[in-house]
C-alpha cells in the first residue's frame, strides 16, 4: 500500500460518568470549543482540525459501571510547539486540576527521542499527554482545514 486509506486520526470519543463535569473540565482547562451538541448526552469539541467527543454513560448502565481494571485506552494527547510551551501549560493547568476533578499523572519529563511531555487525567481518570515531539510539533496545522 503506497498511501493510507484515510486522512489521519482526527476523532476520539470518550464515555464519561458525568457529562456536565467532564464538559466543564475540557472547556475550562483545555479551552476546547463545543461545535455540536446533538442531545443532552453527547457533546463534540474541536480545536480546529480535530473532533473530540464526550458521551454520557446511560443512567441504566451507570449504577453497574465499573471501569476496566487494566484500562485499554492508554492516553490521548495534545501537541505543543516547544518544550517551553509544555512547561507553560503545566504551570497553567496544575493549580486548576483538582478543582476540575483531574490530577497530574506524570510531571514534565524529557524523553530519549527528544520529546518532552507531562500527563494529567480528566475527572474519569482518562490520561491526557501534553506533548512536544520534534517531528510532529513542526507540522503546520491550518485551522479548519484537513
Where do the language-model regions lie?
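Vicinal oxygen chelate
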Residues: 16-20, 76-123
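N-terminal beta-strand motif that seeds the catalytic metal site of vicinal oxygen chelate
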Residues: 1-20, 76, 134-146
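Amphipathic alpha-helical segments
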Residues: 20-33
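Short, flexible turn/loop "capping" segments at secondary-structure junctions
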Residues: 2-6, 66-71
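Conserved short beta-strand elements that form part of the metal-binding/catalytic scaffold
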Residues: 33-70, 127-132
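A short, acidic/glycine-rich surface segment
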Residues: 59-65, 106, 137-140
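Residue-level marker for the onset of beta-strands and adjacent loop->beta junctions
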Residues: 10, 31, 40-41, 74, ...
